[in-house]
Amino acid sequence: MSVTVIVGAQCGDEGKGKMVDLIAQDYDLVIRFQGGDNAGHTVVNQYGTFKMHLIPCGIFNQNAISLVGTGMVVNPDELQKEMKQITSAGMSVDNLKISTRANILMPYHRDLDELNEQSGGMSIGTTKRGIGPAYAGRATRTNIRFGDLAHQDYLKSHFEKVLPAINHQLSFFGAAQYTVDQLCEYCSNWYKLYNEHIVDAFTLIHNMMKENKRILFEGQLGVMKDIDLGIYPFVTSSNPIAAYAAVSSGIPARSITSVIGVAKAFSSQVGDGPFPTEVLDNCIVSLRGTGKNIDDEFGARTGRPRRLGWLDIPVLRYAHTINGFDTLAICKLDKMDSLPEIKICTSYRYQDQILSVFPDTEILGQVKAEYETLPGWECTTRGVNSFDDLPENAKSYIKRIEELVGVPVKYIGVGPARSDVIIR
């Protein structure tokens, strides 16, 4: 039995979608285990170019089951758009399954998210997709789940209980309110759309484990956005770490046989929060591109330009400590082809002392990044399919990352497509 987890080792946007698309070709079940449609996984393969927000990137292996997992909050309307994107490319979604326990992100969740951001009281630059309110609803047990869609009487009773408080919040902002009949109609329509896809995920996963099937878990965002261990409060509302793959799916933690951490060859971040290695001059900013190319540094969901900086080794070490990476995938090495020299942040300095542990948010905003400088390679790595064929300075850069983090780099991305990966 093989149970592999792929997670982001930075702040998201590392290239997880591409790596899942590649690695999922050898798996029987691919599970998105947390998050919602607030971030996207970009995939480029023989079927076309796709920006996936909810559906696991394993959907492109038509012989595997792709599961929208229990730990997710799912906007049914956005899910339908993605399904149409897949079928329009000539693929089937018959292998797409949805956990009965996956929470449904309702229209009022999005309303509340946007209203909270607009109020300016505690704006952290969210995507306004309703993720925070949906996870809050899960914690307060006011949400409904996909399994509930089959029970109209229960839904009516549930909304009669919870809707007054929700409408009270909406009225505070002067926003439009909802009726019970309106929400029940939404649910009736969603049930017609998804009835054949809804499954008992717990039983499905355990049955496949008993059959020694290969299972791949796909995380969203990255460890630095973890609600508990990330750069709080500039975080998401779930746990995009390897351990949560087991927690949200109901499998023993020891069932996980390998963890792959995905990182970019540099650093990026969308939204607010401390960013010790951020660079504002043209050297790094030129890597962003214009937004016209699929691999330019703009958010897959929001289209916002990403903040950019040098590779941050303290972040990768921290991510490794939390997740226990067996291997790393370093993506977008090709984006650095034009740089004459490359810096790596090896440590943080705070009040004239080198920090030995990863700091809390307040201190992180005050640290000074300590760098070492390596020569660039100033030639293209696009089209290279062997580590030995990389420029010497590019190989040295990868080896230095391995030395500093203490994890072998198995995968190296040198372009946006599934085929643009060197496997060592």
UniProtKB/Swiss-Prot annotation:
Entry's EC annotation: 6.3.4.4
Biological or metabolic pathway of the protein: Purine metabolism; AMP biosynthesis via de novo pathway; AMP from IMP: step 1/2
Group of enzyme by EC: ligase
Compartment list: Cytoplasm
Pfam families associated with the record: Adenylsucc_synt
Residues annotated to bind GTP: 12-18, 40-42, 306, 332-334, 413-415
Catalytic activity: IMP + L-aspartate + GTP = N(6)-(1,2-dicarboxyethyl)-AMP + GDP + phosphate + 2 H(+)
UniProt keyword list: Cytoplasm, GTP-binding, Ligase, Magnesium, Metal-binding, Nucleotide-binding, Purine biosynthesis
Superkingdom of the source species: Archaea
Keyword Iron listed: no
Key word Metal-binding present: yes
Binding-site residues for IMP, renumbered to this chain: D13, E14, G15, K16, N38, A39, G40, H41, T127, R141, T236, R304
Cellular-component GO terms for this entry: cytoplasm
Residues the record marks as active site: D13 (proton acceptor), H41 (proton donor)
GO molecular function: adenylosuccinate synthase activity; GTP binding; magnesium ion binding
Annotated positions binding Mg(2+): D13, G40
Binding site for substrate: A300, R301, T302, G303, R304, P305, R306
GO terms classed as biological process: 'de novo' AMP biosynthetic process; IMP metabolic process
Main location: cytoplasm
Described function: Plays an important role in the de novo pathway of purine nucleotide biosynthesis. Catalyzes the first committed step in the biosynthesis of AMP from IMP.
Membership in a protein family: Belongs to the adenylosuccinate synthetase family.
NCBIfam families: PRK01117.1, purA
Subunit structure and binding partners: Homodimer.
Protein name: Adenylosuccinate synthetase 1
